Each structure stands twice: as C-alpha cells, then as structure tokens.
Amino acid sequence: MAAIPSHNNLLTINHKNSITGSSSLNTNFSEINFPAKFRVATRALSRTDESSLSAVISRLERERRERQGLLIEEAEGAGELWMTAEDIRRRDKKTEEERRLRDTWRKIQGEDDWAGLMDPMDPILRSELIRYGEMAQACYDAFDFDPASKYCGTSRFTRLEFFDSLGMIDSGYEVARYLYATSNINLPNFFSKSRWSKVWSKNANWMGYVAVSDDETSRNRLGRRDIAIAWRGTVTKLEWIADLKDYLKPVTENKIRCPDPAVKVESGFLDLYTDKDTTCKFARFSAREQILTEVKRLVEEHGDDDDSDLSITVTGHSLGGALAILSAYDIAEMRLNRSKKGKVIPVTVLTYGGPRVGNVRFRERMEELGVKVMRVVNVHDVVPKSPGLFLNESRPHALMKIAEGLPWCYSHVGEELALDHQNSPFLKPSVDVSTAHNLEAMLHLLDGYHGKGERFVLSSGRDHALVNKASDFLKEHLQIPPFWRQDANKGMVRNSEGRWIQAERLRFEDHHSPDIHHHLSQLRLDHPC
C-alpha cells in the first residue's frame, strides 16, 4: 500500500489500483504529486460525498486505462468495454471480412477456381484457409496418440463438447458425428494402438468428424449453412508413405459408383475409406458409409432452407488430405450435393500437405463433377510429391496420355498454393522432412503470405508459438520451447477414493447416428449405378 500526501489529504492506492481516502478531505482543488505517469489533477471532496468520490475514482481509472492505450467502447447490454487501439482495429477488420465473406463466399469456395485471389493473396481467402486448417488441426489436438493410454486411438473429448474442450469456443460449429476407420493392412504405420491388453477397440481409430455451422454463424458470418468434414492425418511420423503400394485401382472395385472404370485411386487410400469391421461397434460401418449417411441426413435437413444456402467443405492434412479429396469425389459422384428440390450444393476441398490420390482420369472426373480443390503445400515437404514420383502431372501431357493406363501414373487435382518456410523469419531454414510437413507451420506460413515475391508479414495476429506445439521449428531466439503441448497429468484424474485413474471416456451415443441404417438403405451402396 503506497501512501501519497497531498496537503492535508492522504490518499492510498491499493494493489487493485483503486483509491480510498484515509483522512479528512477539504473542498479545495489540489495537485497530487504522483510520478509523471500517474499525475492527475483532482478535487478534494467531503468524506461524506460518496457519489462524488466514486466519480473521481471512475475518472482516475478511466485516465489510467487511457494512458495504457485503452479506448472506451459502448457495448449494447454490456456497458462500457475497454479495448486497445489494436483490439479495435482487429475487431473492425474481422467485421469487414465477415461482411465480405457473406457477399463473396461462392468465390472464396472456388466457384471460379480462385482466379485472381491467390496472387496477391486475398485476405478473406487467407482467413478461410487458416480457419479450415484449424479445423483439421483440431483432429490432432483431440487425438490420443499415447500407446500407454488404454484409449489410444480415440478422441479425448466427447462430440458435444469437442470445440469447447479445445478452446475453440467461437468456432460457430457443432459436431454432428465422429468418424472411425478400421485398421488397414496396407497402412499399418498410420494407426495408433494401445499397449493395454484390454482396450476400447483392437481394430478401430478415430478419424475425424462431421460438423455443421450453427444459426448465428451461418447467418452473420458465413452467408450460408456449411457442412464441414475434417479428416485426421499424421502429426510427425511419415512411415505410412513407405507403406503405399503405389498401385492404382478402379474405384468401382470397392463398389464406389462411377460411369468410367478408368477412374482410379491409390489402393491404400481406397481400402482405408471403404473397409469395415462388423465385429467392432465403432468400425462396423466403413468411413465411407459414415460420411455419406451423415451428409445425406444434413442435406435433407438444410438443403432447401428458404433463408440460407448450403455448402459442403472437406478438409484434411497429410493422409487426411487424401481422404478429404476421395470423400468429396464420392459425395459428388453419389449426387448427395443435390437438395430434394434439385438445388446444387457446392463441394470444396481444402487440403494441407496432401499426397496425390488418383490418376489423370480421376482428376478429370473431379472437374466434371464440379468439385473444387485447393491444395496448400510447403515446397520443402516430401508428402505432396508422393506417390507418383516419376509419372505425374509435371510430365508432358502427351507422355501422361500414353502412360495413363499404368498403375503408377498419378496426377494432383485442383489448384496449388505453394508456400516456402524459408521465407518466414520465425522458422529455422533447415529442418527434417517431418517438420517441413507440420500443419501448424503451414498455417503460420499462410498468415504471412501476401503473394509471390512479397515480404512475409503476419496479418491476423495468430500466435507464432503454435508452430512449436508439436515440433521444434521456431528459431531459438524466440525462446518458445519445442513440443510444448501436453495433457494435464497425461489424462489421469483422481477418483472418489483418492486414487489416480484414467477417466472413462467413450460414450457410444457420440459415435453412430441411430438412423444410420435408414439412410444406408436409401443410398443402396451395394447396388451398381
């Protein structure tokens, strides 16, 4: 408590910066000899004049905040709010971007293949790429990778609390269902398994989620209702690339309807998407069946709303990017992006560090169906260069036409946004292949990208410390510890007896919709087109 004399008055300032009188006060004007940064002129008041004293205290508090660079804002229903000039600038910028997004969302979703939006970089497109990238990152942040956990391979959070548990309280989306896949013999290094003898499932892994934007977000931020599908990929281990058979097979071999048997996809991706294990309650439906039934249900619910349009956005990183492309193709091929009244719902794919998925004919079929794909890549990342190291879209068109029947002739789909981590002053210029593949780093690169040859300048205030959440990518002088994200007590909690245990996590009602059989029967997936 600091005592400050002023003539016959003694005012005290406590640790909360409030001011109280501790002696009689006269009615003369006086100067309080604070240090320069605290100096104010005030009027001594009668100790019985509590309302006047309160007014002085409020004025002093207001002046203190103004000296700190805080500005007052009137908030409807919330009184006065104090914000820095930078806070107000960012708020106004966000408000303007949301207005623009409502007006231009079809272009941002790729209606014109993002013509004129990538160089220079459109700020709305950048914000949306970061936002959907964070939805893909949420799959990593929620996933239990720990083999010492009996819940290894699951989401650490329930469906209804998913975004709130991750601190994404302003996401504006609600998770409609979780996605699971069965362990695939072709990709053994992709799945995480517990070392416990008794586990939640021996063959399944949590793969992501389907979410839908809420009413307020749809109306005030997005300009439409959005169905978002996020696929989990791989955080650091890239051994799954070596597992790829580098073998293309027709999608029709896995009962995906397609009028052209020449449309082919890498066999490992295709099997992961369509395989199921009828003995496991989490994977008794394939990932494909889970996706298609949920999209069908949501389109039936929202597809013909009179007051809003509808979009479908699929996102994923790494192998999750491959599954995002494959599932978006399937949705369009099954014509699930059509409402009951025949309205066409745009389907957009946003991938980050994703591999090639299919052959040239697969790419052409995606274009025929109108599926828009944007691929964000780090030019130093090896994953987007696989599979199809030798025969791919970079070869002459004539050569690709000759070789397109070969089972190892691949082609990327859609538009590519190429970023370079060596342009960021925050990141180490030389790193290993898994670090160059890091999703948080790609979101950081997006935040600073303004166009080819433009200086790297962060634009949104997104914290660069997130890059080191699961990597050692930031330069040492920034003093951000590597791999800093960890769960409190590794998920252990105390029970009523005072013992430390792993909290019960799985609730079956979070996983499979009760009407999945109804929608499956209507889809008739086992019947040829």
UniProtKB/Swiss-Prot annotation:
One of its GO terms (cellular component) is chloroplast. Its EC number is 3.1.1.-. Disruption phenotype: No visible phenotype under normal growth conditions. GO terms for molecular function: galactolipase activity; phospholipase A1 activity; triacylglycerol lipase activity. SUPFAM superfamilies: alpha/beta-Hydrolases. The active site is at S318, D381, H437. Residues 1-43 form a transit peptide. It is an enzyme of class 3 (hydrolase). It is found in: Plastid, Chloroplast. Its main location: plastid. It holds the Pfam family Lipase_3. Disulfide bonds: none annotated. Induction: Slightly induced by wounding. Induced by wounding. Induced by cadmium and selenium in roots. It catalyses: 1,2-dihexadecanoyl-sn-glycero-3-phosphocholine + H2O = 2-hexadecanoyl-sn-glycero-3-phosphocholine + hexadecanoate + H(+); a 1,2-diacyl-3-O-(beta-D-galactosyl)-sn-glycerol + H2O = an acyl-3-O-(beta-D-galactosyl)-sn-glycerol + a fatty acid + H(+); a 1,2-diacyl-3-O-[alpha-D-galactosyl-(1->6)-beta-D-galactosyl]-sn-glycerol + H2O = acyl-3-O-[alpha-D-galactosyl-(1->6)-beta-D-galactosyl]-sn-glycerol + a fatty acid + H(+); a triacylglycerol + H2O = a diacylglycerol + a fatty acid + H(+). One of its GO terms (biological process) is lipid catabolic process. Keywords: Chloroplast, Hydrolase, Lipid degradation, Lipid metabolism, Plastid, Transit peptide. Widely expressed. Highly expressed in leaves and stems. A motif (GXSXG) lies at residues 316-320. InterPro entries: AB_hydrolase_fold, Fungal_lipase-type. Belongs to the AB hydrolase superfamily. Lipase family. Interacts with SBP1. Acylhydrolase with broad specificity. Catalyzes the hydrolysis of phosphatidylcholine at the sn-1 position. Possesses moderate activity toward phosphatidylcholine (PC), monogalactosyldiacylglycerol (MGDG), digalactosyldiacylglycerol (DGDG) and triacylglycerol (TAG). This is Phospholipase A1-Igamma2, chloroplastic. It comes from Arabidopsis thaliana. The gene is DALL3.
